[in-house]
Amino acid sequence: MSFDNVRGRSTPGRPSRTPQVSGTPSIVEQLVRRPDGTIPFSVEFNPPRDAAAEARLWRAAREFERMHPAFVSMTYGAGGSTRDRTARVTGQLARETTLLTVAHLTAVEHSVAELRSIVGTYADAGIRNLLVLRGDPPGDPLGEWRKHPEGLEYAEELVRMVRGLGDFHVGVASFPQGHHRSPDLDRDTAYLCAKLRAGAEYSITQMFFDVDDYLRLRDRVVACDPVEGAKPIIPELMPITSLRTVQRAEELSGRPLPARLLQRLEKAAGNDPEANRNAVRAVGIEIATEIGQRLIDEGAPGLHFITLNFAKATTEVLTNLGYTVTATPVSA
């Protein structure tokens, strides 16, 4: 396979809608029911910040290998050693495990030249599946977004750039409740359709807790563009394991936890959240299981879990949903 375009100028014109990437399965190709009848699932990892965090990530990766996820994704750590560690660990996941690996790529604070270089690094590691995002300002997701003077303004532009660089499968983000920077849901849906028309093959949602928001998103995309509306929208969820993780969940979802769910967690916590932490965790697992089951019932193409580099809570939810674990990691 030629990598000639990866670090050079992009190929003009619209990329083909169904890229042929020799030797690298696409995410869409993985979205078929498993032999046991369950729908595909996938997991998200975060770049490890130090050696201890990296060891924890690898333990989680080996645990998930035993459940045969359709793919794993690695979020993007921008800048300095975090960026370098992200690229290295993402490449190792692709080379040293059986896990189909998706690398996140964000436009924020990068020039086009830097973005091309990052894509080239992933290509050199054999990674041909990218999740393309505009990204939030580091340190303040709600802060003012500023385009790099030599960078890109919109995720749609980044999709076109990546597709013009060579053989890549591209996914994008979608937002069941709308992105906080979008003026309204109709405009937000139009942005998603533009990213799909630019060459994205699927989207992964921002985390949410109300399945109806996901269903309404699907309907909006079909109404916006019936052709692009046929592309998979993979829902993202995260088990809440303590009251402390509620704040993290709200940051990731961009919305407050629904009152009915918060009440269930607070009831389990009682007057002593620390003493009742196991009860709170059990309710969090129960809530994630309920959300996952409804998504399955509503025909979701897969389930994508935020793991924070821990396997236990997600594997418990998956077990509740009927997924099985093999005796040993498949690449051990």
Model-found features: residue ranges?
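N-terminal amphipathic alpha-helix/helix-capping segment at the start of soluble metabolic enzymes
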Residues: 2-43, 50, 55, 327-332
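Active-site pocket-lining/capping segments in soluble small-molecule metabolic enzymes
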Residues: 19-31, 149-175, 225-291, 321-332
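Active-site-adjacent beta->alpha loops and helix N-cap segments on the catalytic face
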Residues: 24-25, 53-54, 80-92, 111-118, ...
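Active-site beta-loop-alpha junctions enriched in small/polar residues
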Residues: 45-48, 75-79, 104-110, 135-137, ...
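Short, acidic/polar
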Residues: 51-64, 86, 112-119, 184-194, ...
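Catalytic domains of carbohydrate-active enzymes, especially glycoside hydrolases
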Residues: 59-75, 197
